[in-house]
From Swiss-Prot:
It is an enzyme of class 6 (ligase). Its cofactor is Mg(2+). Belongs to the ATP-dependent AMP-binding enzyme family. It comes from the Bacteria. The lineage of its organism: Bacteria, Pseudomonadati, Pseudomonadota, Gammaproteobacteria, Enterobacterales. GO terms for biological process: acetyl-CoA biosynthetic process; acetyl-CoA biosynthetic process from acetate; chemotaxis. PROSITE patterns: AMP_BINDING (PS00455). Gene3D superfamilies: 3.30.300.30, N-terminal domain of ligase-like (3.40.50.12780). The keyword Nucleotide-binding applies. Changing residue 517 to P: Results in a 2-fold reduction in the catalytic efficiency for both ATP and CoA. 3-fold reduction in the affinity for ATP and 4.5-fold reduction for CoA. Its EC number is 6.2.1.1. It comes from Salmonella typhimurium (strain LT2 / SGSC1412 / ATCC 700720). Monomer. This is Acetyl-coenzyme A synthetase.
Length: 652
């Protein structure tokens, strides 16, 4: 259970680490026993306009879930990420941008980024955007995406970043739910040599009759391709920024003022707008960034995540910039145009800290030594993994091949809702085990409970909960606090339920075992099965659908959809392709089912509930123990599904 082999802390890390094993134990104990003192001290990592007196004011009690940190303090996120660095480090590179095309890259200093953010902040104000308004950002991985986010934070507008891979329908849904007043996009995005029609997708999204709040669309010229233009509504980024003043005084924000909404998949269909506020979130992003990556001034840091995900918010931009770091933003993909691209970028920019996803690691691992061919990688000091549990084989390959057996791998477990790292090694403090997220970060109190909510002691397995609040915790779901309580605090009373299962070994190390609810993890991205099922049954020929995840060598999980057609409809290769494209259009390429399993009926209980447990086992080819099928209305369905499964070609 524990995988006994531990990787010791390398001498070069131990010699200069920010936190050693003794300090970890001492600080962790203090953070749990006296969170007010501990987090009161950590809050000083930021500059405050009005210093806080209160630190923690939180409740997980049923019907009274309330989370407030530093609630009487005021600050500005952009001032903490930019202005305060100007005097001593204005000429330090804030963002290294590496384009999709290997010949394109640029360095943007803190002073230049500050100037651009001030200009764009003034642009937003000129367009009538004010504190509390929601701005939707649907951008490629270009520095202007960071400028837009920081400018929103500077004036107190709430940003809602939408991943560039989402479809027009998904974009519309997020704009409607958040009542966004402005959309910021580009003519096109570029990824692995292909262009992505971002402006066209926005145009299509805004045709939805329920989108009534958007007044303007700001468009960045990325490729220069022809796009449709709506006079009066659409505005060019460059025209606006050229006439805007580079002087802007940042808005004083209360620590509990909203900073951003980020939509994440739920198990019940409609995506949830996770709301983070300003003070506690930034304290947590900066503190976790500093200690987990053992950040030293001058380090070059690269997080491969897209800005459209929480990792891009906390650990591509806000955490690093709050610490005055140099952060690398990459427009492309790790294995294009050659499998060695990621390592080439590491060498080109002399990256010291690399933070990427198991999906990328497994894709490179499949290429063997081609992934490292002709590269040196000796600048690397720390490696990190994010997005899903990393399997021990991929962990060992990453450590051995990319890090040359000298770089600790920080395998970080956290979520959109947690704002920052929850369970993670600290490089100089915790010995590593391949595949384990190891120990909790300061102030984080994990527990494993059984299905009745009873805490399980010692080496055990169970539902992963957190028993007390931490500063980076999401405060609510936008416009739906009731759903927030229902989703995270109703399963187990007085605890935050992560939706993940985990096991703890005899050393107290945590091993994440994956979702225990109906949320899939595809290439590190969360997708709700209900969301995909809703898209499937919206197809005119489909009567019913059930979606489950199956193990996939590269993506972690693949999407397996059981589909029942309307009476009189017949399966065909044409319909197979049509249904997959339909889901792609409704949600986005990420949600495209890998397998469609045509069937006449699904296993249901007498009350009509679909038995997903059985569907998961059949899809994964695990038929050794299907459990009790006596509660099924028609137990014969299972045999039929098993027969059909034999004829299905599975994705490799």
């Amino acid at each position: 259970m524990s995988q006994t082999h531990k990787h010791a802390i390398p001498a070069n890390i131990a010699d200069r680490c920010l936190i050693n094993p003794e300090q970890y134990e001492t600080k962790y104990k203090q953070s749990i026993n006296d969170p007010d003192t501990f987090w009161g001290e950590q809050g000083k990592i930021l500059d405050w306009i009005t210093p806080y007196q209160k630190v923690k004011n939180t409740s997980f009690a049923p019907g009274n879930v309330s989370i407030k940190w530093y609630e009487d303090g005021t600050l500005n996120l952009a001032a903490n990420c930019l202005d305060r660095h100007l005097q001593e480090n204005g000429d330090r590179t804030a963002i290294i941008w590496e384009g999709d095309d290997t010949s394109q890259s640029k360095h943007i200093s803190y002073r230049e980024l500050h100037r651009d953010v001030c200009r764009f902040a003034n642009t937003l104000l000129d367009l009538g955007i004010k504190k509390g308004d929601v701005v939707a950002i649907y951008m490629p991985m270009v520095p202007e995406a960071a400028v837009a986010m920081l400018a929103c934070a500077r004036i107190g507008a709430v940003h809602s970043v939408i991943f560039g891979g989402f479809s027009p329908e998904a974009v519309a849904g997020r704009i409607i739910d958040s009542s966004s007043r402005l959309v910021i996009t580009a003519d096109e995005g570029v990824r692995a040599g292909r262009s992505i029609p971002l402006k066209k997708n926005v145009d299509d999204a805004l045709k939805n009759p329920n989108v009534t709040s958007v007044e303007h669309v700001i468009v960045l010229k990325r490729t220069g391709s022809d796009i449709d233009w709506q006079e009066g509504r659409d505005l060019w980024w460059r025209d606006l920024i050229e006439k805007a003043s580079p002087e802007h005084q940042p808005e004083a924000m209360n620590a509990e003022d909203p900073l951003f909404i980020l939509y994440t998949s739920g198990s019940t269909g409609k995506p949830k707008g996770v709301l983070h506020t300003t003070g506690g979130y930034l304290v947590y992003a900066a503190t976790t960034f500093k200690y987990v990556f053992d950040y030293h001034p001058g380090d070059i840091y690269w997080c491969t995540a897209d800005v459209g995900w929480v990792t891009g918010h906390s650990y591509l931009l806000y955490g690093p910039l709050a610490c005055g770091a140099t952060t690398l933003m990459f427009e492309g993909v790790p294995n294009w145009p050659t499998p060695a691209r990621m390592c080439q970028v590491v060498d080109k920019h002399q990256v010291n800290i690399l933070y990427t996803a198991p999906t990328a690691i497994r894709a490179l691992m499949a290429e063997g030594d081609k992934a490292i061919e002709g590269t040196d990688r000796s600048s690397l000091r720390i490696l990190g993994s994010v997005g899903e549990p990393i399997n021990p084989e991929a962990w060992e390959w990453y450590w051995k091949k990319i890090g040359k057996e000298k770089c600790p791998v920080v395998d970080t477990w956290w979520q959109t809702e947690t704002g920052g790292f929850m369970i993670t090694p600290l490089p100089g403090a915790i010995e590593l085990k391949a595949g384990s997220a190891t120990r909790p970060f300061f102030g984080v109190q994990p527990a494993l409970v059984d299905n009745e909510g009873h805490p399980q002691e010692g080496a055990t397995e169970g539902n992963l909960v957190i028993t007390d609040s931490w500063p980076g915790q999401a405060r609510t779901l936008f416009g739906d606090h009731e759903r927030f309580e229902q989703t995270y605090f109703s399963t187990f009373k007085n605890m935050y339920f992560s939706g993940d299962g985990a096991r703890r070994d005899e050393d107290g190390y945590y091993w994440i075992t994956g979702r225990v609810d109906d949320v899939l993890n595809v290439s590190g991205h969360r997708l709700g099965t209900a969301e995909i099922e809703s898209a499937l049954v919206a197809h005119p020929k489909i009567a019913e659908a059930a979606v489950v995840g199956i193990p996939h060598a590269i993506k972690g999980q693949a999407i397996y959809a059981y589909v029942t057609l309307n009476h009189g409809e017949e399966p065909s290769p044409e319909l197979y392709a049509e249904v997959r494209n339909w889901v792609r259009k409704e949600i986005g390429p990420l949600a495209t089912p890998d397998v469609l399993h045509w069937t006449d009926s699904l296993p249901k209980t007498r009350s009509g509930k679909i038995m997903r447990r059985i569907l998961r086992k059949i899809a994964a080819g695990d038929t050794s123990n299907l459990g009790d099928t006596s509660t099924l209305a028609d137990p014969g369905v299972v045999e039929k599904l098993l027969e059909e499964k034999q004829a299905i070609a599975m994705p490799s």
